Amino acid sequence: MPELVVTALLAPSRLSLKLLRAFMWSLVFSVALVAAAVYGCIALTHVLCRPRRGCCGRRRSASPACLSDPSLGEHGFLNLKSSGLRLHYVSAGRGNGPLMLFLHGFPENWFSWRYQLREFQSRFHVVAVDLRGYGPSDAPRDVDCYTIDLLLVDIKDVILGLGYSKCILVAHDWGALLAWHFSIYYPSLVERMVVVSGAPMSVYQDYSLHHISQFFRSHYMFLFQLPWLPEKLLSMSDFQILKTTLTHRKTGIPCLTPSELEAFLYNFSQPGGLTGPLNYYRNLFRNFPLEPQELTTPTLLLWGEKDTYLELGLVEAIGSRFVPGRLEAHILPGIGHWIPQSNPQEMHQYMWAFLQDLLD
């Protein structure tokens, strides 16, 4: 009898949760269809303006020389204990200090940390990984292989597999989302965090529900919920949408050279090269709604005032979840989303100051 009473009392809450999830998914796919129409028009325009490129992306047969620059470190592979997957990484400065682990975003790879690898290898063991699905790292095809839980276990296995019990975690964009959650579920493995242009998913969900303008900034996330179509649209006219994302005069990465652009496009141009990265997004809303969680890891947060994809209000929202005194946040005036590549000197100054006590 008590079980029946409890079930009856919980029924309204469960029904409300199901209705909320149904509403959320209907909203997600409605926006996804609108985004697909918009991006379809953009992709078609690129094809019409550049007919010689055709409707498909050109497969690159050789990687650009900048990916083999010895000044950035040595290339290696790590077999992960939990999944058996093999992840690619670039490492420099082993034996020079604590482990500094870099997590990249989309549409990037380990190479997005080239400035930081050079800057910090004198005092830290710097390691930039290609997350699962990216670059030469293993890329399972199944969408279910890219859940947040599995990605967090990958990070844990990288830290332990490199022979460390903790690290300084430096992350941008998608890597930032993973870093936030990693610090919650594996706090003993994170000594400090440096987070650039990225919010915890629970903060992002709550903020977006109250600020519809953030939904519009994140329109691409909804497009990526759809199967196969995003891969097709992003590859049309030789990956022109990705090229524009990375090189746009106002919203892209300033001074990105043709060779550096190819460093990002090379692996995306391989068969199935976009599916793994897009599967991250296809798992993004699975656990909606997320419960807010307290953040306790000492963290340096850097945010571009002109970030195209994320509103400034998210900085305050992130701060409200922190234990007092654990967050140091800086908004960089006139700077956009790609801080590690567009403004490395400013980023390095903040990082050295934030980490100085670990080096004394």
From Swiss-Prot:
Q: What does the record list as GO biological process?
A: epoxide metabolic process; lipid metabolic process
Provenance organism = Homo sapiens
What catalytic reaction does the record list?
A: an epoxide + H2O = an ethanediol; 9,10-epoxyoctadecanoate + H2O = 9,10-dihydroxyoctadecanoate; 9,10-epoxy-(12Z)-octadecenoate + H2O = 9,10-dihydroxy-(12Z)-octadecenoate; 8,9-epoxy-(5Z,11Z,14Z)-eicosatrienoate + H2O = 8,9-dihydroxy-(5Z,11Z,14Z)-eicosatrienoate
| GO MF terms, alphabetically ordered | epoxide hydrolase activity; hydrolase activity
Query: Entry's SUPFAM superfamilies?
Result: alpha/beta-Hydrolases
Activation and inhibition: Inhibited by 1-(1-acetylpiperidin-4-yl)-3-(4-(trifl uoromethoxy)phenyl)urea (TPAU), 1-cyclohexyl-3-dodecylurea (CDU), 12-(3-adamantan-1-yl-ureido)-dodecanoic acid (AUDA), 1-((3S, 5S, 7S)-adamantan-1-yl)-3-(5-(2-(2-ethoxyethoxy) ethoxy)pentyl)urea (AEPU) and to a lesser extent by 8-(3-((3S, 5S, 7S)-adamantan-1-yl)ureido) octanoic acid (AUOA).
Effect noted on mutating Y281F: Loss of catalytic activity
Keyword Cell wall biogenesis/degradation among UniProt keywords = no
Which UniProt keyword terms apply here?
Answer: Endoplasmic reticulum, Hydrolase, Lipid metabolism, Membrane, Microsome, Transmembrane, Transmembrane helix
Protein location: Microsome membrane
EC number, UniProt record? 3.3.2.10
Q: What is the role of this chain?
A: Catalyzes the hydrolysis of epoxide-containing fatty acids. Active in vitro against epoxyeicosatrienoic acids (EETs) including 8,9-EET, 9,10-EET, 11,12-EET and 14,15-EET and leukotoxin.
Family label: Belongs to the AB hydrolase superfamily. Epoxide hydrolase family.
Q: What InterPro entries does the record tag this protein with?
A: AB_hydrolase_1, AB_hydrolase_fold, Epox_hydrolase-like
Q: Which Pfam families match?
A: Abhydrolase_1
- Gene Ontology cellular component list: endoplasmic reticulum; intracellular membrane-bounded organelle; membrane
Membrane topology term:
Single-pass membrane protein
Annotated active site? D173 (nucleophile), Y281 (proton donor), H337 (proton acceptor)
Q: What happens on changing D173A?
A: Loss of catalytic activity
Q: What protein does this entry describe? A: Epoxide hydrolase 3
Q: What are the TM regions of this chain, as residue ranges?
A: 22-42
Superkingdom as given in the UniProt entry = Eukaryota
